[in-house]
């Protein structure tokens, strides 16, 4: 039953998202602003510190643009469809990840209902159909929270730190700060001492910085003080 409902949810996600992403042109200034960075990566070959259409350094970390550029390289060019694909895939991953999380704790029926409600939420669905970093950031944060909860039950949060590192590479330190703060409050509510909760989350946060630090170091080596000014 669980596998059947998982497949149903996956099919609904694919059918309601993937066929429609390229039907409209870019309709906000934010969409082409992200797509042009991926276009710049492909044209210049600079995937570390790309520039936007005006020649300025892109002010967001590059994971979202890497995904667009990779998909567009396969397709042959940057299009509305390839530019929106990372957001759609992030939404699908978030919904299916949520299904697996809730199916284990509340049953497959509740998990399926959760997935359908999430997918049909207007703002979530809109973000999953746009070429913006927000859906990918949200997906990584939500998946990190699922893993942190799982690690509160048992285990070490290695996967959570990977998700938070990817979230930071999508839109900056909020990808680490937000899930750590939420989990810290959760631990306090559960009766964990303040210092234990604080140092546990501090260790998780520091570990999560390793992956994005690799890009920040490479970007600084290439951009120097201009990159520091942009980040600060």
Predicted ranges, named:
Residues 1-232:
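Membrane-integral, polyisoprenol-dependent glycosyltransferases
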């Amino acid at each position: 039953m669980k596998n059947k409902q998982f497949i149903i949810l996956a099919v609904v996600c694919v059918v309601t998202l993937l066929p429609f992403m390229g039907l409209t042109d870019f309709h906000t200034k934010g969409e082409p602003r992200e797509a042009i960075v991926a276009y710049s990566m492909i044209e210049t070959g600079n995937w570390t510190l790309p520039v936007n259409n005006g020649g300025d350094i892109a002010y967001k970390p590059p994971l979202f643009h890497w995904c667009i550029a990779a998909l567009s390289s396969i397709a042959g060019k940057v299009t509305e469809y390839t530019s929106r694909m990372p957001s759609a895939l992030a939404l699908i991953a978030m919904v299916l990840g949520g299904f697996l999380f809730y199916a284990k704790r509340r049953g497959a029926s509740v998990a399926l209902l959760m997935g359908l409600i999430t997918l049909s939420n207007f703002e979530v669905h809109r973000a999953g159909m746009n070429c913006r970093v927000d859906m990918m950031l949200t997906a990584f944060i939500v998946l990190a929270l699922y893993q942190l909860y799982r690690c509160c039950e048992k285990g070490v949060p290695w996967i959570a730190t990977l998700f938070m590192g990817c979230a930071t590479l999508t839109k900056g330190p909020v990808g680490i700060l937000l899930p750590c703060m939420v989990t810290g409050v959760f631990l306090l509510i559960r009766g964990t001492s303040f210092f234990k909760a604080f140092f546990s989350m501090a260790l998780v946060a520091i570990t999560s910085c390793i992956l994005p630090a690799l890009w920040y170091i490479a970007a600084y080596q290439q951009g120097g003080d201009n990159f520091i000014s942009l980040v600060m």
